[in-house]
Amino acid sequence: MNRSGNSQTTQKLVNLDDIWSELVEGIMQVFEHEKSLTRSQYMRFYTHVYDYCTSVSAAPSGRSSGKTGGAQLVGKKLYDRLEQFLKSYLSELLTKFKAISGEEVLLSRYTKQWKSYQFSSTVLDGICNYLNRNWVKRECEEGQKGIYKIYRLALVAWKGHLFQVLNEPVTKAVLKSIEEERQGKLINRSLVRDVIECYVELSFNEEDTDAEQQKLSVYKQNFENKFIADTSAFYEKESDAFLSTNTVTEYLKHVENRLEEETQRVRGFNSKNGLSYLHETTADVLKSTCEEVLIEKHLKIFHTEFQNLLNADRNDDLKRMYSLVALSSKNLTDLKSILENHILHQGTEAIAKCCTTDAANDPKTYVQTILDVHKKYNALVLTAFNNDNGFVAALDKACGKFINSNVVTIANSASKSPELLAKYCDLLLKKSSKNPEDKELEDNLNQVMVVFKYIEDKDVFQKYYSKMLAKRLVNHTSASDDAEAMMISKLKQTCGYEYTVKLQRMFQDIGVSKDLNSYFKQYLAEKNLTMEIDFGIEVLSSGSWPFQLSNNFLLPSELERSVRQFNEFYAARHSGRKLNWLYQMCKGELIMNVNRNNSSTYTLQASTFQMSVLLQFNDQLSFTVQQLQDNTQTQQENLIQVLQILLKAKVLTSSDNENSLTPESTVELFLDYKNKKRRININQPLKTELKVEQETVHKHIEEDRKLLIQAAIVRIMKMRKRLNHTNLISEVLNQLSTRFKPKVPVIKKCIDILIEKEYLERMEGHKDTYSYLA
């Protein structure tokens, strides 16, 4: 029986010399690969290391001697002998390389030895695992420099004793192989890749004992920097030579191929796909170098060719050039400028050509010409330039310029484009035999909005559109109420509620008028009143409709009674309201039976002015112009135009030429009137009305602009309180840019008006600064 109490375990002391001869023999076997270690051999060597590291030394070695209490960690002598072994082994290995000649042989031998050495170092690291986990770890934690885990120690030895001597010829051989591959020769990519992997594996900081930290210093300094320099030199020489014997478009294809080849060299390095051999961190610098040499140095040539490609509509080549130049967005500036100028020129020329067919009076041709240019280059920007924002902006700028300034606007007025666009809308939305289907009409209206976006004077468009919409509504000539509402909705989305509020009120007035007609008929029935004619009205709110009051005019007695009855009805229904009749907008139908040889009757669709003249001939067959003027109280200028229309229609006849009528000229009812049609429309606008209408539009535009400018100034100053002249002008221009471009002198005049009205004042001592007066 053992006596109970404390027992002391005695540990065997292992002398390094006793185990080293067997251990070094095994290590040499690992590095020479004469035959593989058996499992039992591996475990025996591992045990030697373990026993040595765990033995208690009576005379502690190394830095362990400073510690007291408990067993000391042993390992420095073993570590030193391992380090010395590696140095000796590598020195002997280096002598074998001196006899090698030829780059490929050198690469083959170097990569073979590296892989073997790397594998052997891994095995040695496993054998010395206990040393790594204890003595090495403790030394590293205490900040001891130059101490590494055994695998890392092996790499440090390779780096210091073999790599430093061989890296230059090896790197030179690798670079030569890459150049040969660029020249179209087949190379052994795996050799290049293995060398690169060696450089990457050796890229650690020797001052950093953590093997996981990888700075790629060896790779960068000994390979990448030289590789990038060679790449730049190679492609600089090649690009100059290629461009001297090939077209620019062929060069673009060549550059595409070259960039893809370089991408393949670096793509998927970690995946070992067999095609790549450069480390992934080289991707960016390689890309930028190739782009600089292959693209940026030849931008001037590209710019010239870009214009040629635009002229020739070579969209595929344009796309290729864009995709290459766009690799660096800063290089696109000149291309965008060239595109803008090209579209501007093409648009201006297209409008100039269509003007030979009087496009100034043909809104459809004018607008379609603009749309054709926009469609062509919008498709180009979308497909060739990837809808790049900068190229979209170039398209927009160019379209804005040629739409607002071209031969049509210069020959007529700056407001001609919005006027013609409004007239084109009128063609689309007015009833005709050529009205498109709903889907096509919607597409056409969408195209209108494309052009509308570029119109600078949107207030001019609004005036003309409003006037034409008003006529469509009162004349009931709209092709579709839905289409009208759709167009107003599109304008509202683009310009806001205020822009379309009057247009929407017009629709409301037409709806209210339908109800009023029904109420008027009920009123007549309740009063037992009869109507001698079929009578209908539209009651329009004066602030929303772009019509002017009629000139003096004596309503025919046949119409006067109906007008009087409606006035009485409306006054009873809406006390205090006053109706002003727009006779120039009224129309009706007359039944005419004048032919002495047959009883055929004709229905004439006529204006109220025309009706007032024709109804005179129920009493007698001929009148002088003066007599008709006295009877109708129509202005002579207007009356003569009415008579000219009736004479051209052969309803009346005169011995005088229709273009030289005087107050004494006599006109007669043409009793032999014949026409194949039974319904004849003779309702034509008077030239004087059109002239007044045109002058009124421009007058109202200028007046409205002044009011808008003043309102903008007040809004800005109310918010800012104080503002200098330059900033106020700038903010006014910015606020109103979506409606029109105010002229600076007009803004200045509006500021003066507001000062007079005491909305603003100039600050004392700062005459260029204004303050808002609440």
From Swiss-Prot:
SUPFAM superfamilies per UniProt: Cullin homology domain, Cullin repeat-like, Winged helix' DNA-binding domain
Predominant subcellular localization, coarse grouping: cytoplasm
Pfam family, one: Cullin_Nedd8
The Cullin neddylation domain, residue ranges: 704-764
Biochemical pathway: Protein modification; protein ubiquitination
Function as written in the Swiss-Prot or TrEMBL entry: Core component of multiple SCF (SKP1-CUL1-F-box protein) E3 ubiquitin-protein ligase complexes which mediate the ubiquitination of proteins involved in cell cycle progression, signal transduction and transcription. In the SCF complex, serves as a rigid scaffold that organizes the SKP1-F-box protein and RBX1 subunits. May contribute to catalysis through positioning of the substrate and the ubiquitin-conjugating enzyme.
Known partners and oligomeric status: Component of SCF E3 ubiquitin-protein ligase complexes consisting of Skpa, Cul1, Roc1a and an F-box protein. In larval neuroblast self renewal and asymmetric division, as well as ddaC dendrite and mushroom body axon pruning, the complex contains the F-box protein slmb (SCF-slmb). In caspase activation during sperm differentiation, the complex contains the F-box protein ntc. Interacts directly with Roc1a. Interacts with Fsn. Interacts with Dlish. Interacts with Cad99C (via the cytoplasmic domain). Interacts with Sans.
Expression sites by tissue: Expressed in testis.
One annotated GO biological process: negative regulation of apoptotic process
Phenotype of the disrupted gene, per the record: Severe dendrite pruning defects in ddaC neurons at 16 hours after puparium formation (APF) and axon pruning defects in mushroom body gamma neurons at 24 hours APF. RNAi-mediated knockdown results in a significant increase in Akt1 protein levels and activity in ddaC somas. In the larval brain there is a large increase in the number of neuroblasts, 40% of which show a spindle misorientation at metaphase. RNAi-mediated knockdown results in apical detachment of scolopidial cells in Johnston's organ.
Protein name: Cullin homolog 1
Cross-link (Glycyl lysine isopeptide (Lys-Gly) (interchain with G-Cter in NEDD8)): K718
